[in-house]
Amino acid sequence: MKLLAGRAERRYRISNNSNPKSTAEDDMIRSVLWQLLVLGISGVLASTAQAAGDPAAGKSKFATCAGCHAIPGYTNAYPTYHVPRLGGQHADYIIVALKAYQAGERKHPTMHANAFSLNEQDMQDIAAYLSSFPAAAAPYPVRGDTAAGKTKSAACAACHGADGNGIIPIYPRLAGQQEDYLRKALGDYQSGARTNPIMGGMAKPLSPQDITDLASYFASQPKGLVTVQQE
């Protein structure tokens, strides 16, 4: 894959130098090269991150999280947005997120406090529990323009899947996620409040309307995430 991307990159440089004006074909080549790079990195990382926790133990350990993430419609106090749905999320991504909160790489005082005392096994167990939930039975209603969002989502498909149900375990499933949470996440990547080189680069050129449309599209997709319901 690295060789393929390298050859394509050399061809692109030669053709682009002969015609300084960017064309639709050039843009398509850039997109393909970027996705090849992302998929190559993802394959390596995914092979090193395999969650293997105990869902039953995770259910008990999730009790502290349930006060926010097991209440349908619950919102963050400030700024106000719905807390993310976690049921059905990739286990490996849950672990990545918890470690980022624990280390302070993702900024959220409550999440940092809750993740701070977790050990590796705790994270594995919580992740296994959350990933065990079945997908939503029906799509959620949204407010934005899902048709426009679908068109704009092509650049997201390499990591997150065309419908937000991607299979690369270290990247989050987006299908069925809270619409306003997705807007908040994209805005934070764009501003640098959340630091991820790939997402920062992808979000940087988005307009407010792009963010609204993308959030609406992924939030509306079937077989999506669910709010955890504890017995």
Q: What spans do the regions from the language model cover?
A:
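Gly/Gly-Pro-rich "capping" loops immediately C-terminal to redox-active cysteine motifs
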Residues: 55, 59, 72-102, 112-117, ...
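Sec/Tat signal peptide C-region and signal peptidase I cleavage site
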Residues: 47-51
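Sequence/structural segment immediately N-terminal to covalent heme-attachment motifs in c-type
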Residues: 52-75, 141-165, 177-178, 231
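C-terminal capping alpha-helices of c-type cytochrome domains
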Residues: 116-138, 189, 204-231
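His/Cys-centered metal/cofactor-coordination and adjacent catalytic loops
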Residues: 74, 78, 130-140, 175
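Short, Lys/Arg-enriched N-terminal segments with co-localized hydrophobic residues
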Residues: 10-27
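Bacterial N-terminal signal peptides
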Residues: 35-44
